[in-house]
Amino acid sequence: MVVITIFTIMTGVVLANLPQFRDKTFLDLTAQEVAITIRQAQVYGIGTKVAGNEFKSHGINLDLTADSKMLTLFADYDENNAYDSGENIEQLRINGAANFTELDTSVDSPCTPASSQCRLDIVFQRPYPEAQFKFNNGASMAGGNIKITLTSTKSTYAKEIEVWATGQIIVRTKS
């Protein structure tokens, strides 16, 4: 009888925390997938990924005002260090209870999907692993870092994907 009671209590505790566990795990995996997509753009940019018959810079475009669930991997055909229509190679769509909620740079104030314009381009030019940032279609941002916040729509969990101009990519829990 004691064993059944202990088993019932343990099962109840585990099942009560299951939705939170799933939500947190989904957010962790999605943040890692975003970081891997950024790393893929870096590898394509410094490597030998051919776009047409040439080796082009590659990058990531994130436009929160257009779609807060979409990340685009692109080849920079016109070499303007920004995503233009028709340059996409692959699109990562977040299917689930998470959204990109904020873009923050080391030089500008953060923007959100509610902002009038909230767009980021991260470009890796061959043969260098360093990242170049273009924020809100403006001038390129020299140095520093950017933070992309991914937030769960079901809870208060949030992850930050931080990309440094040196090419380092970090995923951490947002505090």
Describe the predicted segments one by one.
Residues 1-19:
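N-terminal single-pass transmembrane signal-anchor helix
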Residues 22-53:
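Membrane-proximal N-terminal amphipathic helix
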Residues 54-126:
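Type IV pilin-like appendage domain
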Residues 93, 123-125, 149, 162, ...:
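Generic structural detector for well-ordered beta-strands
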Residues 132-142:
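Short glycine/proline/serine/threonine-rich loop/turn segments at secondary-structure transition edges
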Residues 143-152:
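Short conserved beta-strand and strand-loop elements enriched in small hydrophobics
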Residues 156-175:
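Low-complexity, S/T/G/P-rich flexible repeat/linker segments used as non-globular hinges
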